[in-house]
Design a protein with these regions (language model features):
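Structural alpha/beta surface segment adjacent to cysteine/selenocysteine redox centers
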Residues: 44-145
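C-terminal cap of thioredoxin/glutaredoxin-like
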Residues: 2-59, 63, 124, 128-131, ...
Length: 234
């Protein structure tokens, strides 16, 4: 698969590169593979922008797990402890919160940074059992960034996904026995193997990777060119 990646304004250019293994096969409609993590605020913003494509395209969503902070223990880590010695550019947090607000998100900075493996396993459960991935993604992001809940906790994950239409009892059983732990690990390995080091990364029709929570107009432009066949197959 050949991929085209773009970053945020001011970022270093991301080169067009080849050598990535194929993402899941794309159908005739617009097929998005969203590589993201639930503790990434820009992933939540990106999801909100991508959702708007559904007004213009027949979109199929596939989730691919990514662990932004793989060293976080199962019980999570306090933000104050994790943030010691870390700084942000002036205005970064205010800009993030305002950008999220513009996307309809009441973004907060939860006091706990959770381990997200259970949340990713819940997403995989939903994917394998006919769940609405848009709703599940939004429910888990909302639980963390807006309700400030610990999405490393089974009860929180089950409640959030249950509100998105997932069978809570079946989900709890799957989380308790680690049914999707190996698949989630495979997805994380796939992402790293294919050079994905930042999220969100959105792969359009298995061929073009757009990095970052880009403006909706850019997402729509890429989707439109692919739908029209303006981009030659490789």
């Amino acid at each position: 698969m050949e991929s085209w990646s773009v970053g945020f304004d001011g970022d270093e250019d991301v080169e067009r590169h080849s050598g990535m293994r194929d993402a899941p096969a794309a159908g005739p409609a617009l097929h998005l593979t969203l590589v993201s993590d639930y503790i990434c605020p820009w992933c939540y913003v990106g999801l909100a922008r991508l959702e708007k494509l559904r007004d213009e395209f027949d979109v199929t969503l596939v989730a691919c797990a990514f662990e932004l902070r793989p060293g976080i223990p199962p019980e999570g880590i306090a933000r104050d402890e994790y943030s010691k010695g870390r700084t942000y550019p002036p205005g970064y947090i205010d800009n993030l919160i305002q950008t999220a607000r513009d996307a309809g998100i009441d973004m907060k900075r939860p006091p706990l940074i959770p381990n997200t493996r259970l949340a990713h396993q819940a997403t995989e459960f939903a994917s394998k059992n006919g769940g609405d991935l848009w709703a599940v993604h939004r429910a888990l992001f909302h639980a963390y960034f807006e309700a400030e809940e610990d999405i490393g906790d089974t009860d929180v994950v089950v409640r959030a996904c249950g509100g998105a239409g997932v069978d809570p009892d079946a989900l709890r059983a799957a989380l308790d026995d680690g049914r999707y732990a190996e698949e989630v690990q495979c997805q994380m390995t796939w992402s790293r193997t294919n050079g994905i080091s930042g999220v969100p990364t959105t792969i359009f029709n298995g061929r073009f990777a757009v990095v970052g929570a880009q403006d909706f107009d850019l997402f729509r432009d890429v989707a439109g060119r692919i739908a029209r066949g303006d981009v030659a197959a490789t």
